[in-house]
Amino acid sequence: MITLIWCQDKHFGIGRDNTIPWKLTEANQHFYNTTKNQTVVMGYNTFQELGDKLTDHNVVVLSKKHFEELQNNTNIKVFNSIEKLLQHHFNRDLYVIGGKQIFHHFIELADRLIISVLPVDFKCNLRLKLGLDSFELMQEQQHSQFKVQYWHKKHPERLSFNVFLEDYNGTLPNLLELLIDKKFNLHQVDIAKITTQYLHLINTNLNKQAIEPITDYLVITSRIVEQKANNLLQINDIALDSDFLDNKLRDKLVAQLVEYKRYRESLDDFEKLRINRLAYFSKDNDFNRFIQTVDKSNTEPVKIEDELPNYVSVLKLHHAMNKLMQRWRAQFLANKNISIQELSIEQVQAEILATIKQFGYHSVSLKRVLLKVNHHISLMYFITAFVALLVLINNQIIDIEQTSFDDELYICLLDSSRIEQLQETPEAMVERAVKQRQEAQELARQVAREKAIANAQKREAYLKAKYGKDYLTREQFLKLSPEERAAHVAKMKQLKLVKNDNGRDN
């Protein structure tokens, strides 16, 4: 949970000349008790003002300009971007305490606001005015010197679309349930009233963040309007069987309502996926950040990670692949079914190499390669092909060329004899993988056998040292007669008892 906490005077003032103008013990104690032992996030100026007083807090400073300056401070954590800060403190409570720019950056991410309001004017030249339309006041506590307001972010369900008809008062999703279960007649739905109420709801929340949760009601409302319009236009068409037509149109509408309900139920899951995706870390396109020198005496820069060959940067490769993807975008979107396609990078590598070989050229455009693929190109195949290209480049099997930023991407074979050797069919590749797995299992069994033999040899050496000439190996013991075995066992038991007694005496 992200909480914004600050103190302001009656005119929204929060500071004067980068300092806090009031010295109120009660207000300071409230701030300390609320944030004690918590992670507090602040900017550089706020850290300079309050940093030495936050001894019982986990201090986090967000600053790009002073990032290098504060990095050596072991008592705090410093970040130069909100994304990195949130990634490092994922699923932790954060208290944002200032200053003004930090509040503006975090207001849309905040779940709660704690505002201490002073009843007087402190002549501040730094004021904080945030839009609180997406929050609602849950509680207000009055103290002797100030009052504290607790604001919580509005839940989307509280902004649901409520319709008021002659025979029904409630939310649109509940009306949807009644229509699906055929417990409410479509002819009783007053479209004019629903449309008027929906437009009023949109106009009321037009400039607020709250508009997002209710926009999806537009689809289902338009479906009901369409159904009602079709019924009205076909009343006088005596050539059609009205009962059959009504049932057919009603069934079509019910099917659409059921599909809409499924989308509504899946929104929460997609929202969780979206939030989880925000915590992922992505690598920058700029390779300059990976350049470093070995030591001070060596001024020549050394790259930790090499660029792609022929000066084709990752950005250019991404741009070229994105252009190809846009050409197939309409084809991808036309397919409404989400299917799971099992693909391996090795399989796609083999297909790419086989396609290049079919053209008989030294180099061929990636577009022609993908167009030559025998099966249907899906989005999953396209992404796998992108990864396969990177693997082939990394293994120095192919090279890529591009004359300009917007030009086609061309693939070149580096070693034709090596390509011939690596060229495999999917069946041969599966067979090779199975063979490799069997070899790995056999190797594991061989290692286990060798380990068992080594342990047996160690045990035999230990027993020989312990019992001397009286010790017999398993093979020697099996060659004895039953009488000799019984005598040997009795002798060994006696030796064990004697050795145990000697050990206790010592």
Curated annotation (Swiss-Prot):
InterPro entries in UniProt: DHFR-like_dom_sf, DHFR_dom, ScpA
Positions of the DHFR domain: 1-166
Gene Ontology CC terms: cytoplasm
UniProt GO molecular function: dihydrofolate reductase activity
Keyword Cell cycle part of the UniProt annotation: yes
GO biological process, one term: tetrahydrofolate biosynthetic process
Cell cycle in keyword set: yes
Region of interest (ScpA), residue spans: 167-506
Assigned keywords, A-Z: Cell cycle, Cell division, Chromosome partition, Cytoplasm
Localization: Cytoplasm
Description of how the protein assembles with itself and partners: Component of a cohesin-like complex composed of ScpA, ScpB and the Smc homodimer, in which ScpA and ScpB bind to the head domain of Smc. The presence of the three proteins is required for the association of the complex with DNA.
The protein's name in its UniProt record: Segregation and condensation protein A
UniProt gene name: scpA
